[in-house]
């Protein structure tokens, strides 16, 4: 998916403006890992910015962009043919489109443990007619990419497909390439987890990388698990509208309650995610905002360490018991203060005498 006017066959058309003369930054998107395509679907809801704003390069200072995304790539292949969409990826391998950002969706299966066949592939080898595995594409393209972005928890850390007992040996991109891996531009793997992603988190991260590629932003700040620090630096609890109830020791026992959901299985106090603050679409929604528990889907230990999802977290029993004890005292003190503050001052009344305490100078 890309803007039709400035880019054709990877070359800029001459039109007199600096933006149109500039070669585009290509986005090569591989969604052939083990996944449900939920991250691609989620991204269509992005608004800050939207994928259309990125593809059309309408944001101030954003370079021309050509997005080659299997979900909605309306330009298809380099010669406008649906049958050769995969040619963009061969061009990336041959170095004919540069720079490009490699986006990987889905966890990476271990092809080495399979004696025959393959776990997942993306396009065919034109010489043999056999599928090219997802891991082989990563081997071919990652060394030539400006940056590698793992979209969704499956690509970031393995996710559901990498659960204990899985037959594929699935893993995340950092597990496959190495956690210390860096692109030719010196950029670490960038992980935007979520099951699926919060759409604006990914679009904002992608825009940051595009600005960085053109020298308009410093090196992207990441935490120890390669997540953008400004997006995943706080916990769900720290941005949750229900956090005040936790402090006061008030916990929901049913899902129709507005109180804290910890006893119903919410992991918000320890999960790094900004969904309660950011919402989901146009700032609306987000798991605890609409009555859902946080199941830890942005964390490297998801899902194994958070199961079973509907049970109270082990540490929650201790913390909620302690919170209930001191929360009762806090509530009582606040009620006393509230009763004092919930009354008008006594001097606001009728009468012939001024009782506000004002002393006239005459």
Regions from the PLM with identified roles:
Residues 1-85, 89-103, 186-189, 204-362:
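Iron-sulfur (Fe-S) cluster-binding modules
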Residues 28, 147-152, 190-192:
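Hydrophobic/aromatic beta-strand patches that form the interior of the parallel beta-sheet core
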Residues 36, 110-112, 156-160, 198-201:
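Short, well-ordered, mixed-charge alpha-helical segments that flank or form enzyme active sites
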Residues 98-100, 144-147:
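Loop/turn elements at helix/coil->beta-strand transitions in domains of secreted/extracellular proteins
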Residues 99-114:
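Short acidic, glycine-rich surface-loop motifs adjacent to enzyme active sites
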Residues 111-131, 159-166:
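Glycine/threonine-rich flexible loop motifs
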Residues 129-145:
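Catalytic-core regions built around general acid/base machinery
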Residues 154, 158-185, 190, 194:
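Class I SAM-dependent methyltransferase SAM-binding "motif I" and its flanking Rossmann-like core
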């Amino acid at each position: 998916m890309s803007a039709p006017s400035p880019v054709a066959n990877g070359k800029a058309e001459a039109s007199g403006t600096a933006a149109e003369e500039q070669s585009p930054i290509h986005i090569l998107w591989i969604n052939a890992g083990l996944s449900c395509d939920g991250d691609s679907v989620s991204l269509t809801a992005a608004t800050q910015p939207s994928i259309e704003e990125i593809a059309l390069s309408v944001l101030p200072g954003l370079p021309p962009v050509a997005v080659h995304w299997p979900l909605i790539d309306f330009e298809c292949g380099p010669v406008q043919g649906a049958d050769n969409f995969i040619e963009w990826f061969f061009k990336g391998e041959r170095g004919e489109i540069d720079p490009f950002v490699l986006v990987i969706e889905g966890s990476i299966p271990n092809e080495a443990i399979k004696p025959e066949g393959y776990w997942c592939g993306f396009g065919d080898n034109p010489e043999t007619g056999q599928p090219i595995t997802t891991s082989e594409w990563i081997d071919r393209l990652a060394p030539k990419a400006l940056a590698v972005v793992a979209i969704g928890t499956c690509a970031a850390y393995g996710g559901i497909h990498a659960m204990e007992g899985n037959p594929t040996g699935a893993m995340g991109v950092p597990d496959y390439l190495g956690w210390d891996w860096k692109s030719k531009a010196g950029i670490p793997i960038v992980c935007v987890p979520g099951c699926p992603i919060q759409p604006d988190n990914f679009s904002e991260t992608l825009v940051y990388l595009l600005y960085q590629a053109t020298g308009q932003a410093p090196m992207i700040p990441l935490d120890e698990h390669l997540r953008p620090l400004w997006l995943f630096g706080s916990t769900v609890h720290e941005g949750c509208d229900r956090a005040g109830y936790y402090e006061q020791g008030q916990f929901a026992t049913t899902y129709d309650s507005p109180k804290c959901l910890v006893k119903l299985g919410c992991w918000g106090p320890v999960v790094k995610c900004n969904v309660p603050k950011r919402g989901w679409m146009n700032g609306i929604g987000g798991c605890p905002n609409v009555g859902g528990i946080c199941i830890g889907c942005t964390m490297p230990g998801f899902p194994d360490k958070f199961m079973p999802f509907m049970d109270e977290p082990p540490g929650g029993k201790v913390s909620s018991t302690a919170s209930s004890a001191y929360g009762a005292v806090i509530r009582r003190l606040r009620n006393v203060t509230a009763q004092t503050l919930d009354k008008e001052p006594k001097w606001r009344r009728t009468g012939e005498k001024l009782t506000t305490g004002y002393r006239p100078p005459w």
